[in-house]
């Protein structure tokens, strides 16, 4: 019967489900960058809109001034170009 099967499955997999919930909660918290960091990145973006590809040195400087990792800087620019840039 369905109720018995449900009970068995819950008994067998409840630990896994709990771990999955914890993992999902951890990952959800990482979605937004701090407001100040976003503002600094957007300022750079606006100044360089025609060619929004920071050099490695500029990425290092942005990482230091925002407190973000360089990978986060790279990902932000990739996403920003994909979503908002219309090359002229």
Swiss-Prot record:
Give the InterPro entries listed for this entry.
Answer: ELK_dom, HD, Homeobox_CS, Homeodomain-like_sf, KN_HD, TALE_homeobox
Q: Which residues form the ELK domain?
A: 4-24
From the Swiss-Prot or TrEMBL record, state where the protein is found. Answer: Nucleus
Q: Name one Pfam family in it.
A: Homeobox_KN
Tissue expression? Strongly expressed in ear inflorescence primordia and shoot meristem. Weakly expressed in embryos. Absent from leaves.
Q: Where are the transmembrane segments?
A: none
**Entry's Gene Ontology cellular component terms:** nucleus
Q: Which GO terms describe its molecular function?
A: DNA binding; DNA-binding transcription factor activity, RNA polymerase II-specific
| Keyword annotations | DNA-binding, Homeobox, Nucleus
Keyword Ribosomal protein present in the record's keywords: the answer is no
Start-end of DNA-binding region: 25-88
Keyword Transmembrane tagged:
no
The protein's job, in short, is: Probably binds to the DNA sequence 5'-TGAC-3'.
Q: Which PANTHER family match?
A: HOMEOBOX PROTEIN TRANSCRIPTION FACTORS
Membership in a protein family: Belongs to the TALE/KNOX homeobox family.
Q: Supply the name of the protein.
A: Homeobox protein knotted-1-like 3
Gene name linked to the record: KNOX3
